[in-house]
Amino acid sequence: MTEKAYAPGESYAYPLILKKLLTIPLIYSPDREIVYRDKTRITYRTLNERINRLANGLTRLGVKPGDVVAAFEFDSHRYLECFFAVPGMGATLQTVNWRLSPEQIVYTVNHAEAKVIIVNAFFLQLLQAVRDKLTTVKKVVLISDDGKKPETPLAVDAEYEELLAASETRYDFPDLDENTRATTFYTTGTTGNPKGVFFSHRQLVLHTLSVTAAVGAYHTQCRCRSDDVYMPLTPMFHVHAWGFPYIATLLGVKQVYPGMYEPGMILKLIQAEKVTFSHCVPTILQMILTSPAAKDADLSRWKVIIGGSQLPRGLAKMARERGIEVNVGYGMSETCPVISLANPKEHMLAWDAERQLDVVIKTGRPIPLADVEIVDPLDAPLPHDGKTVGEVVMRTPWL
């Protein structure tokens, strides 16, 4: 796009937009790998090309700024491409929770007014059953791991890889208003129908910067830095996998995407790709640790942030006995989500393992730029003494 010419002394209003997160990895680590299961390996350089191709392909399908593109996909490099291409165009990415009932999926897609659906072939039967009820959807793009189109009566307008192959490698991503809506998803933590949540480019970038500092700057256990190998184990449809794919991309780390969560595949990838950093809910950690495939697996390099529900002390101890570093993070869908992390302070690192367990399973302390207070019914602050009960109130620049 044509850049604005600034007059001498005129300040430049630098927009906090998602495309800026790709700048540094393309300078520092353009040839570092992004891996999908045991099927695909690309570099950051190729990732950037594919993001540009996807934006061009979606444009050919009629996607315009302000439109909504819905994704039904497992954790993959393709989902990561959607994380950048769709918002970068000025459109909105809807990350569809395919675990919802068919009725709730219809409600959320219609409520979001999705124009295009990008769907993994695994979900074709689900989509086929509800397609006639999706009143705003005009186009369907099929994702297939083997590049083949399965037989389906569903009208499919393009296959993902074919769409990219037929598209140019350069798209002129605009300098959007940073308050442009980037993503939307629906939370079921309420009564009635799922409630929509959305985040702007500014909110996502600020959350990314804050959590990057929280997990990388402090001398503590579950650090994530540029020499780590990252694998999400929280679905990318759920609050952008807690925002960590954006963090991993900003840092330019090697990324490993497991697709469908299968213990054998996850453990295979952890060992083969030397994964060092993940995040998940307690049930996923337990699924992995109790899998027969975990018996002889070396998990001693693995660091895992746990959220979504309370981490049982026994499960934390089981993980540590396998050499895994674990701690807890806290947040909500509406907070993007991370608000606090149970990073032990430096002096706590010298404590014995049993004493440290009592620290890492707690909610933790606020991450940088997050203000958190406990208040009484009159909104008066209460002491942070580990005993007093009140209502949690919070404020951040991305809320």
Task: Identify the residue ranges that each predicted region occupies.
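Gly/Ser/Thr-rich phosphate-binding loop
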Residues: L250, A272-C280, L289-D358, D371, ...
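Flexible, low-complexity linker/hinge segments
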Residues: A7-L16, Q128, K149-R181
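Conserved AMP-binding/adenylate-forming core of the ANL superfamily
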Residues: R32-F84, S101-V106, E161
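Conserved AMP-binding A3 loop
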Residues: T43-R45, A182-L209
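Conserved pre-ATP/AMP-binding loop-to-beta segment of ANL
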Residues: P30, L142, A166-Y186, N193, ...
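Conserved structural elements of the adenylate-forming
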Residues: N48-L54, A165, V197-S226, L233, ...
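Structural core segment of the AMP-binding/adenylate-forming
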Residues: L21, N56, R60-L61, G88-A165
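Conserved AMP-binding/adenylation subdomain of ANL enzymes
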Residues: V205-V229, F237-T276, S291
